[in-house]
Amino acid sequence: MIDIDWQTDERVAPCSGNFAKSFQATLGNGEIGLQNTDNGLDASRSFMVGVIDLTPADLHRMALLPTWNSIGLRLADGPNVAEAFAAGKHRDYRQQIDTATATLRTQYTLQLGGVALRVEVESWLSRSDRHLGMVRCRLTADQDCIVEAEVGVRANDTVARHPFRSLVWPHQDYPRLYGGGFYEKRMTYAWHPGHMDVVAVGGSAGEATWGAAAVAAHDGPAVGVAIAVGGDIAEVRDASDQSNARGIVSLRLPAGSTREIVLYAAFSREDRPPHLLKGALAAAQAARARGLESLYAEHAAVWAELWRGEVRIEGNAHLDRQARLDLFMLYQNAPVDHRYPMQIMGLAAPGYYGNVLWDVDCFSWLGLLPFAPDLAISTPLFRRRTLDQALLMATRSGHRGAYYPWQACPYAGEDNGPMAQHNRAIHMTFEVAQTMWLQWCAIGDRAFLRREAWPVMAAVADFACSRAVWVPWEGRYEYKEVIGPEEPFGVIDNDLHTAAMAQRILRLAVRAAEILGLGADPLWTAVADHMYLPRNPRTGFWQPHSGSEKPSPRRWTETTAYHLADLPASEAQLRDAMVPVGKGEVITDPEHNLPWNLCFHALAAARLGDEEAFALVLKRQSTIRVDPGTFGLRCEMAGNDAGPYITGCGSLLQGLLHGGTGLHWSEKGLTPRYSPCLPAGIERLTFTRLRWHDQDHAVTVDRRQGLCVETCD
């Protein structure tokens, strides 16, 4: 169904391996994330959702699991495969991600002395059983030989610690510690993964099974990881020590025949370490007993169901491929354990410490919602679960209600950012409340509205009132000393987007109370009705904040408010929002290297019916910070290549869906709000399955036939 063939891209050659400038592709199954390696065999970084290093002086960070996926090959008493590969002694290299089944395939031929060894590796994380992962290595030699493979579960090295909780962003400690070059150095210095201590190892050569139990630093969550080895094994011996459970397996390769090694990896959690280890070992052995083909068939069937919802674009092959790859990244990185949210850089990269920022609520989550509301629900449920933290944060700041942190730890929702001043970005709190409302719009479940959404929306409405300042001589409420979405403005008064979001949330809270038959605080309506939204007194246009009568240079503030806060905008205002596009800045300005803001320009162009501008912005969105050498994955900005930027994936999909179809969220699901607009050059835009109110819908925009929304069986 979907088989992206990357042979024509850079992946016919290995990446440089320089993680500071080029990140690797990732696999995910909603529970575990795994980075790939060039040769498919080396140990790579692996993470599990909600497993967090809780070291007190440091920031909480995603903890690196013990390594489990490596197969250290060598000819018996001969050359090492990894060393030969690194030395360039390979040919016919190819690496693919089969997006239909989230399977990474790597193949090449190595010259090891006088032996030509063909290596074919497949790696995948089970979607049908999220606690399983598989690696299969198939070997073919041109002459008789014996191959040895070191396998097992190993501890990772500890990392240097720094007192990030006491640092001040950005003008004091950071430049001193980094020696300048913040973006270039923060990835290795600040965004390293957290640590897990291996506390027990087990397994035996007799069972060809090895495992370890590990605890995230400072009494964090515990995990058991085990592998069972299958395939054409001739001999097994143990090589374990106190911190590493490992073995050496041997394969006899007759000339021209193919033999294989299979790693069946199992992960367990939520128990004491000895029980975790025992459970993981048993699960790995059970997976081996079931067999690779059976497990893969179940895994592929789950992916086939997910891919009933996809996007197809006729008339632009590049955009079609990038949109589907972006959707693939959202599917991979949406947690299936509903205690945990989506993370800004997904499950396999420690960028932003694994935190939850506004990017999740407004871009990646919102991009996934129409395709898979049952997966997307993990983020609003996380916001509900961490409401007590938000209530506490509001109290500590001297306000009523709930105040969500700018960077929330996915473990417990507490403030987990070094940028204390960014907690002035209170628009984040209002967007959390909107997340709850939009999830209800998607599923139409009043029980969810009452139990999950309402407590958050009511508490945020209280905060919106408490944080607003009444200015009696103006007869209005204002927001002083805030940071808006256009962060270069710094701390300002009366950010347009912040005020518009607050007004919207207050009115949505009143509406939610009406639906549920509950009482709404009259102050909510009073504050909403008297909220100050700054306008230019001469033009009547919205202005970005009260200290500037000029539009924002790139119109980020205004366009963000038009879409997220549903702020009314005249045709003249929308055309003004497109000025940066008309000037070509959307192509040439390095500040437009942030994929998220382009979403709003795309939507403004679509509302105007400007097909050429719409196409131009989408072209930029589908190419900016996209690395074909890592399967088209995105990074955030120049110098910040810490991992796949999931925000950009959701941003492109929102522009296509809401701009192309004109459909927007309402209490009835996705309903028409604006005329559909196909970008120039595109003949047909199809969403094969969008889901709202427990019903599947196929949505198509055709250049000749217009918009068609059909209910699916």
State each model region's role:
Residues 50-118, 612-713:
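Non-catalytic C-terminal accessory modules of carbohydrate-active enzymes
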Residues 269, 348-356, 402-454, 462-524, ...:
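The feature captures the catalytic groove of carbohydrate-active enzymes
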Residues 70, 80-86, 319, 323-324, ...:
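Carboxylate/His-rich catalytic cores and anion/metal-binding grooves
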Residues 356-387, 434, 438-442, 451, ...:
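Active-site core of glycosidic bond-cleaving carbohydrate-active enzymes
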Residues 336-349, 391-405, 466-483, 532-544, ...:
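Glycine- and aromatic-rich loop/turn segments at beta-sheet edges
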Residues 1-352, 713:
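Acidic/polar, glycine-enriched structural segments that form the non-catalytic walls/loops
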Residues 325-336, 385, 389-392, 403-409, ...:
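Glycine-rich, acidic and aromatic/proline-enriched surface loops and short helix-turn segments
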Residues 295-309, 313-318, 337-345, 379-380, ...:
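Short coil/turn segments at secondary-structure boundaries
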